[in-house]
């Protein structure tokens, strides 16, 4: 089960793939569960996240550990997070340039989001049931 006590400060950190950012989200928990601002434009841009337009909003659900999706690359940016459980995320830069073929991996849980720039492939495998 996700423990929100370790997620109290918003941070935005660029990964080894240029333009791909790891976002640590403040999560506020109590006896009812937890709450988070999944995306807050002004705060995140002030910390270095690029401005982007929402082109499409997708939600996926996987009932079993080990479900794998990807790798997918679309001609738009992505903002990825989970509402429950953990996934092992993997990204590969498909853009022409010095970072072509570079791979980055990171675990995502409800306190973590990833900004994926267009041209970078995205995939994940669930580490828990009901993600």
Predicted regions and their residues:
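Conserved metal-binding segment of the jelly-roll/cupin
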Residues: 107-128
């Amino acid at each position: 089960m996700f423990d929100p006590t370790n997620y109290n400060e918003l941070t935005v950190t660029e990964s080894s793939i240029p333009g791909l950012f790891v976002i640590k989200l403040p999560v506020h928990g109590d006896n009812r569960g937890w709450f988070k601002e999944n995306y807050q434009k002004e705060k995140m841009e002030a910390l270095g996240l690029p401005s982007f337009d929402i082109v499409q909003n997708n939600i996926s659900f996987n009932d079993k550990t080990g479900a794998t999706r990807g790798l997918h690359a679309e001609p738009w940016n992505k903002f990825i997070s989970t509402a429950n459980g953990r996934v092992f995320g993997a990204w590969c830069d498909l853009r022409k340039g010095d970072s072509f073929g570079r791979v980055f991996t990171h675990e995502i849980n409800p306190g973590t989001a990833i900004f994926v720039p267009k041209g970078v492939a995205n995939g994940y495998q669930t580490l828990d049931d009901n993600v």
